[in-house]
Amino acid sequence: MNVLTYNVHLWEGRDGRMDIERLATIIEHSQADIVALNEVLHPVETHFGVSRPLAELANLLRMDWAFGESNRVVQMAGWWGPVGNAVLSRHPILDDTNHYLARLPMTQGRNLLTARIAVEPERTFTIFSTHLDHAFEGTRLWQLRGVLAPLRDYAAEPHLLLGDFNTHGPTGPNSQRLTPPVVRVLRNNGYVDAYMAAGEGEPGTFPLLWPFRIDYIFVPQILQPQLQSCCVLTGKLIEQASDHRPLMATFAWN
């Protein structure tokens, strides 16, 4: 089972265009079964009316979808709308829940989207998709409390926490970069950084030039034996589609 996390930059590519077919091609080629998306606008308003790029993307990929807004509206060049996180799945999404995260006055709203997926008739898999504050580690730690609270109910069940955590992580086992507090807290709560456990290739996801690690897939210890690999996807199309590169982890599911 392939699980992907991808910040789609409010649907704007580096060429300034909203190209949903381009994103669909990237995800289709990745062979992802489940996708967590950050910086998703849904629905989108333009001077010509309302569109739903998230639903269009899901239709192109023949996937179920869920969306949770972050209580924030973003204005782009030519389009605008509520921003949040989304989940796409080749398997049926049974239900979804949106959790608003703490924020300081005059800062951006953030949220955690929970999607429970029926990967088999009698087995479910839960995805938690989030995007933490971009400015301060202290705010991210505060928001992380709101992330961990619902996760505790799933401690004994298969689940993943993934998304854009906006915290610069170590780049490999021999990295001299200190483990940031957000990652330490998650580790102390029983979560494994998928790239540090099974990473292959260069780990940076943002920005495209000289990238850092800010996008993560966190795996509970009960699921770690199934983790097979984790890598950042690259390619010409990916370099044009967003200001982030997608991160994918592969699990044995039996």
Spans of features found by a protein language model:
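Active site of divalent-metal-dependent phosphoester/diester hydrolases
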Residues: 16, 46-51, 63-87, 167-241
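Active-site metal-binding loops of divalent metal-dependent hydrolases
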Residues: 7-8, 40, 132, 164-165, ...
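Surface-exposed cleft-lining segments at the edges of enzyme active sites
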Residues: 10-14, 42-43, 98-104, 130-138, ...
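Beta-strand-turn-beta hairpins that frame and shape the catalytic cleft
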Residues: 1-4, 81-85, 89-94, 107-129, ...
